[in-house]
Amino acid sequence: MTTQFSVEGIELELTRYPKNQESNLQAWDAADEHLIKHLKETEQVPVATAIINDNFGALTACLRSMESQWPLAVETDAKTSQLGTVQNLENNTLSSDNIQWLNSRENIPGAIELVLMKLPKNLSYFAHQLNRLSQVLPEGTQVLIGAKAKSINKSLLELFAKNLGPASASLTWKKTRVITCTADGKVRALPTESQWSIPDLNLNITNLSNVFASGKLDIGARIMLDNMPKGDFKSIIDLGCGNGVLGLNAKQLFPQAYIHFVDDSEMAVESARQNWALNKLDTLGLVGEQATFGWDDCLTHLNEGIRPELILCNPPFHQGEAITDHIAWQMFLQSWRALKNGGILHVVGNRHLAYHVKLQRIFKNCTTVASNGKFVILQAQKISKKAEPHENGESSSDTPNPQSSLYGGVKR
């Protein structure tokens, strides 16, 4: 893997986030290079620019290297993308001043004069993004999209015309093309959220456009729901929560529990939040917020004082279009650190991913709870001789649950 980005006289050191990933993965692709090449060749001057789907900040860093105060609004659904962009700006001594950071549901400023995008894998999400742009971009605004040449076809160009304005594609360079779309000034309505139900669990589910398994229960979650852990848990984390279905069911099974939902996708976190409210799962009389929600890189920014008794985890094995197991490693390692001594990590995964090897290495134990031809449910318990914080007198007896620091303390 190279970390040296070099295009049209721009020299940068770019790394993925987090840095400790497979050596064959890099922080940008040829579509990033093609977009920058296009800007250089057309002698684009610095104007108020929105950058959308910039995986690890290659586009953002390039524009700030071309002009240190290039006015930018940077939108992403992935927390790791935002953190990676900040990391690469810092590593290249580039200013992040006056960059407006947006999640995938916030509207870009109305004063934007140029938009740079990368084509995401999820075309329903992409159509949603184009719809949102149609609500704020004046007629004639240019939107430049970098994509693999093989991803561009007639139906994709029709998608542009339907949701934002007419589009055309450049010649191929390094197996990529730049699509130029011109906003037609017509405002499109946002698509309705996907809604469905799980009758046997009495749950109603809403999925935003960039949430995995939109419109149905994925088979990994199904086998997990059929094999939820037994016990009396008061503090639970749904790690990589997606629409939150595992955490929702955990609350049904353990009504005295406090649930924390966390995901790298902001749309996933918002879907989980909406689903909690939709299903009205709060237990009457239980003190404090019974559900909290975090947009985070796994458990990186979880309060160190939090000690969950159970973590439910359905790890992704891809980051964008890259196949990788570093996310599972990170989830398992951070789960071991976060869990209360004796706490359980309950995991579902494809059999071929061999998560049992990782769990055995980290936890020194691993039990197969259930399996079928494709999936396996694994359970690992944290057994540590190191004293828990409360054993050293560090916790107060007036906290309502092991996650009190997450919820802001006791309500009196």
UniProtKB/Swiss-Prot annotation:
It catalyses: guanosine(1835) in 23S rRNA + S-adenosyl-L-methionine = N(2)-methylguanosine(1835) in 23S rRNA + S-adenosyl-L-homocysteine + H(+). Residues 386-412 are annotated as: Disordered. Its main location: cytoplasm. Specifically methylates the guanine in position 1835 (m2G1835) of 23S rRNA. This is Ribosomal RNA large subunit methyltransferase G. It is found in: Cytoplasm. GO terms for cellular component: cytoplasm. One of its GO terms (molecular function) is 23S rRNA (guanine(1835)-N(2))-methyltransferase activity. Residues 394-406 have a biased composition (Polar residues). The gene is rlmG. InterPro entries: DNA_methylase_N6_adenine_CS (IPR002052), rRNA_m2G-MeTrfase_RlmG (IPR017237), RsmC/RlmG (IPR046977), SAM-dependent_MTases_sf (IPR029063), Small_mtfrase_dom (IPR007848). Belongs to the methyltransferase superfamily. RlmG family. Keywords: Cytoplasm, Methyltransferase, rRNA processing, S-adenosyl-L-methionine, Transferase. It comes from the Bacteria. Its EC number is 2.1.1.174. Pfam families: MTS (PF05175).
